[in-house]
Design a protein with these regions (language model features):
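Structural preference for solvent-exposed beta-strand-turn elements
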Residues: 1-140
Length: 140
């Protein structure tokens, strides 16, 4: 387990699958592979360029993305040491979006707030994130 004070050299992967993504294409560029994957549009807001995603538990950086797709670059070491070497177009893979992005999204107006009856989160969502909200919650 990661201890408080330990160096975090990547992104936090909880191991919870958010959805299935489908490998749409794999293109070789030099020694690397560029993989394009499609996923349900509902997860689009949690995927950002240069952000992180876990695909089949492999922590990767997102190159580009849209409402229902993303691309990642797979270096030779990752190709050899992970199950991604089994990927081919049409294969489904487990996708986990970044946990920090989920927390940020939850605070935005129109998000999926209140799922756990969290009044504080719902209040942030209905009013948006304001200076008063941040002051009242210890951010200043």
């Amino acid at each position: 387990a990661l201890a408080v004070g330990d160096r975090l050299g990547g992104h936090i992967v909880a191991g919870h699958v958010d959805c299935l993504a489908t490998v749409e294409s794999i293109t070789r560029i030099g020694d690397s592979l560029v993989c394009r994957l499609g996923f349900p549009e509902a997860f689009g807001p949690e995927v950002v360029p240069k952000g992180s995603v876990a695909l089949d538990g492999i922590s990767l950086t997102i190159n580009e993305c849209g409402k229902n797709f993303l691309t990642v670059n797979i270096i030779p070491d990752t190709q050899e040491r992970t199950t991604m070497r089994l990927w081919k177009p049409g294969v489904s893979v487990n996708m986990e979006t970044d946990i920090i992005g989920k927390y940020v999204r939850r605070q935005l107006p129109g998000s999926r707030d209140g799922a756990n009856g969290d009044e504080k989160g719902a209040a942030a969502s209905s009013a948006g994130i304001t200076r008063d909200f941040l002051l009242g919650n210890g951010f200043f």
